[in-house]
């Protein structure tokens, strides 16, 4: 339990570290932080899809192993992998296709949109890395190697922390640099996870032999309803917050006009 808890805590560092460094950007730190903050609901949606499959698949995988049904366990692992890959490409397509309207729906303005767009455009490119690296990591722990799973997460987090200042300040890439550092760290985590499932420790390998695409697509369609409901609630909450901020700004402007008239 301890390695899993540590891994989850470290996973939270990705976005926190980005915001810490972005908060030290000279001159535009406020707008940059706001822009990156607008992307977090989208990141949460990607994480929700990842957890949907991994947290559902890993326990079923463990149950199948406990029953001694190795074939069923292999099917569960490989079908989860397939769902993660398909969903990642779908989310990338939706994100790139409706990036601008989605960000404005979440409350972007003409000032904050460029920062949000820069971060999201690069971050979406790493959706597959994130979903495989995080989603399949649950199966590493379920197979009995929680420390290995923890080390994968730690490795990704350390790389992100190390690369952030390099790309953001040294290479002067700003928000784009933060996103690039995150994507690189997620890519490394994915490679480590895939290497595990093709190494000597594991008894279960990722193989097309155990992937049933028709069943997987059916599960995706059914399970996606819940995630879209959560995403919808997040959207409504962001729109409400945006409207409240907009109303506050209008009130301040009206008060300023009254003062000037006086």
Describe the residue ranges of each PLM region.
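Short alpha-helical transmembrane segments in multi-pass integral membrane proteins
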Residues: 1, 61-126, 172-219
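C-terminal motif of bacterial Sec signal peptides marking the signal peptidase cleavage site
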Residues: 231-232
């Amino acid at each position: 339990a301890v390695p899993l808890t540590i891994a989850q805590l470290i996973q939270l560092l990705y976005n926190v570290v980005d915001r810490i460094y972005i908060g030290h950007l000279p001159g535009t730190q406020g707008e940059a932080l706001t822009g990156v903050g607008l992307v977090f609901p989208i990141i949460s949606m990607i994480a929700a899809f990842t957890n949907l499959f991994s947290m559902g698949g890993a326990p079923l995988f463990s149950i199948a192993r406990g029953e001694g049904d190795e074939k069923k366990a292999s099917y569960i692992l490989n079908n989860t992998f397939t769902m993660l890959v398909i969903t990642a490409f779908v989310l990338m397509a939706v994100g790139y296709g409706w990036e601008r309207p989605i960000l404005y729906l979440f409350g972007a303005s003409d000032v904050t949109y460029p920062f949000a767009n820069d971060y999201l455009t690069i971050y979406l490119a790493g959706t597959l890395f994130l979903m495989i690296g995080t989603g399949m990591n649950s199966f590493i722990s379920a197979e009995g190697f929680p420390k290995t799973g923890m080390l994968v997460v730690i490795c990704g987090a350390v790389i992100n922390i190390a690369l952030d200042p390099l790309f953001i300040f040294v290479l002067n890439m700003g928000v784009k640099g933060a996103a690039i550092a995150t994507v690189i760290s997620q890519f490394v985590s994915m490679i480590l996870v895939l290497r595990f499932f093709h190494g000597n420790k594991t008894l279960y390998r990722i193989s097309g032999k155990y992937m049933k695409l028709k069943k997987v697509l059916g599960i995706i369609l059914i399970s996606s309803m819940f995630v879209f409901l959560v995403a919808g609630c997040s959207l409504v909450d962001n729109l409400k917050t945006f409207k409240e901020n907009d109303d506050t700004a209008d009130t301040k402007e009206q008060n300023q006009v009254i003062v000037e008239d006086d």
